[in-house]
Amino acid sequence: MLKTDSLDFHSYLPPYRSLINPNARYDYRTHSLIPLTQNDLNLLRIAFQKKKEAPPSAFKMKYKSLLSDVSRTISMRLSNSNLLSSSSANNNNVLLSPPPSSSSTLSTPCGNILNRAGTTSSNISKINNLSQNQTQNQLPLFPAELHIKNLPVEILDYIFYLVDDNLDYKSCMYTCKLFYFLAKPYYYENLVFTSTYRFAQFVTYLRVNSEVGQYVQSIDLSGIKPGYDEDEQEEGQEENAENGEEENGGGARDPQYLLGEIADNPHHERVDQFPRGKILAGWRDWKFKNNPLYTIHPSPSLTKIASNSQFSNVSSKSSRSTSSKSSSSTTKKFVKPFRYFKSRKRKMSYSGTTKLERKSPRLEQLQLDQYSSNWNKRVNSHPLINKFLLHYSTSKDLPIGYILHMINLCPNIVSLNLGNLSLSTDYEISRSTIHKYQNFDLINNYPKDLIYKVDNIMRLNDVDDVYSIDGSILRFGNINSGSSGSNWERNGSSSNNRILFKSNQSIASTASSVYSVTTFSKPIRKYNSLLPPLPQTVADISYLNKGDGKVYLSDLNLKEINSAYLKKINEDEILSAIINVHGKRLIEYDTSLYQIPKPLNVDIAGTLKYINLSSMIWLNRKLIEKFLTRLLTKKSPELDMYGICYTDEFFDSDEQESDDDYEDSDDEEQRQCPIIYKQNLVIDFTDSGMYKSLPWAKRIDLNSFEGCQLANKIINNDLMTPQEQALRRERRRRGAIAANYLA
């Protein structure tokens, strides 16, 4: 028999040392990290230090080189756990026991290293004592562990504050629990949505996990675009035409190649009519995601095909109507369904006379210069519109219920931009019948253990390992904030990542939900036969307490229900929600500190600093008057006499004299009236209302005198057209007829 020599892979593979965890080595046999004890590290340090301090003579170095290589011995010890464990044990015996004999020292691997540092056994004990004294005086070779987790939380928060990039915050959320905990508040701080689909996902997630709304401080919905934007598609079509003429010399594309692209897209029936063939999904696609009437059913099984003879007839008719190769291949597949269960026969003859025709592969060109790699397409992909909802492709409306959810669940908003927003009619479900529709809620689009996973990530303690990246960590997709937007759909490549956002609602349950509530199949309780089920009232109460406690028709995957359970919501409910969450608060002022005999009430403003309600055709003067009256705070004149409210130089004397309305007024209180509305708030009503150039449809800056003056006129219903204002000035200039006659 041939005898094979064992290969020493240590001569080819260097000892692995990790920069993250230097106290561990990598074993190439077991493919695992093995920690090094402090005794092993001290032993290696002594060997290296003694080699540098006492260089032997040339004869000894030559003699040692004949025996073995010191560097190779050290590398072998770093890669062999048995040698390190034995050397550390023997090192402890040497330090604690009396000096052994030379023969016993040479019999162990530790003795071999120490024997090279000295020639006699007495010198070994001296070297050990000397090395112990030196290690106490010198700094350790491997200092204490330095990691970002050892920094205070305030410093870590300031570091993440300086990042100021949404994509970087998203990458930090994929790193570890500590980074997820620190980056999450900054990631949701400023949100800018461009897709109604992403905003619908965000609102549903707010109802599932309301704590996320505490982080939001700015929301911008003014950039919402439809799924099919004609201007953008025309620009992209012109760019593609120019690029095609430059690359292909003005030649046309292969029709077979176009057929291949259409066959890959399940919604190719009407997509090919649009330029570039790309229509993004809207909020209705998220609403009817689990509704079987709006979803694409999978292909039927082979047993059903074999039992149903009509299917082959239908397929044969469809094959006669189409002449493409893809349709003919599908008909051949369904003509003989049991062909796949038989063993395949070899058709190639062994005589060698027949020659197989080899098809030439399709040539493809790599576009390395463009930012369109497969990874980016997978991560930044936006779902396309359903073919049953193509007539909504040019609409960019949002239901009123989503806006109300956002306002109620985000109490810390500082900037709210709803400019150019188109609203669609929505209905609120009566509270007495909400529990009947909880199985059809869009909350079921997310897994039931979503809150548990998020809470587990956000719960940091000493047991958590911040170094590891758990594969089961909840990974959100792209959130379209700014250019990236809000993506709540998982786009991971692994199957575990895809399962996380898989709907828990079965096909049978969704099918029954379309017809009636009473036919809904009861869930099968596995392994819970010994435990009593929870009462229905407990489940109903927990469902009613989710989110803001309100459910709208847009929150269900049903198109319509009984109108007796519905209540129509008007657009003015948005103004009422803003007032309830961010309106002024009336509190009693503590008068004991200022020795005031009677209690005083003071208005406290909310957190809002900017509201954009421009281009809202449903707004009118009465709604604006009511909105400003309940939103704006006033400086109490009763506190001025006690010196509690400070008085600023709100406007210059020139500005005050230039205003004719307040200049000609004899009442000093009327002249100073706009000052009481001064606050850090900007409200934009530009181009709102049914008509153009309305006197109240302007930008109101309450930090300026003009803004406070306009707000005062709106509240007091004192708005006039320019002609009426000119007539009023002329009357004041002339005065009364009797007064001029007597003068």
From Swiss-Prot:
The answer to keyword rRNA processing applying to this record is no
Q: Return the Acidic residues bias intervals.
A: 229-248
In which domain of life is the source organism classified?
Eukaryota
Report if keyword DNA-binding is assigned: no
Give the residue ranges for region: Disordered.
224-257, 311-330
Which InterPro entries does this UniProt record tie to the protein? F-box-like_dom_sf
Where in this chain does the record put each F-box domain?
145-191
Keywords of this protein's UniProt record, alphabetized? Answer: Ubl conjugation pathway
Q: What does this protein do?
A: F-box protein probably involved in ubiquitin conjugation pathway.
Q: What is this protein's record name? A: F-box protein COS111
Q: Which gene encodes it?
A: COS111
